[in-house]
Amino acid sequence: YRIIDTTKVIKKLHEKADRVLIDAPCSGLGVLKRNPDAKWKLQPEFIDNIRKVQAEVLESYSKIVKPGGKLVYATCSVLPSENQEQVKKFLTTEIGKQFNFIKDQKILAHESGFDGFYMALLERKESSEQKEKRVQKEIE
């Protein structure tokens, strides 16, 4: 795996990755079971700012997923605004329209005994020509 921390690398890897995992920065509200006082430390401005950062990260890093490739967007938050709503909003953007929503899963601490967590699986659409080329390469 490789951690990408510059936009230069994102441009270099444009549509090159088979799989991308975005472990997005988040409010961390999924770990309230272990840190119950965390909810009192959060400010509304922080949540607003973190949602903007999440949208930017999702839009930027999705560009390195090649057609037919998969992207996982994950947070340790239980807030829909950081999770389902963030993915839904992304899918309406210019780059987001190039992806299909496959599935998502929300893990809640009171149901699972684990920390709260969210993950969504998206797949970048590929044209029939791109799919044909990919299948041909796999055969060779």
Region spans (language model):
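Conserved SAM-binding strand-loop segment of SAM-dependent methyltransferases
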Residues: 1-6
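Short, functional N-terminal and low-complexity linear motifs
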Residues: 23-29, 54-59
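Glycine-rich S-adenosyl-L-methionine
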Residues: 38-65
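Conserved P-loop NTPase nucleotide-binding/switch module
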Residues: 29-40, 76
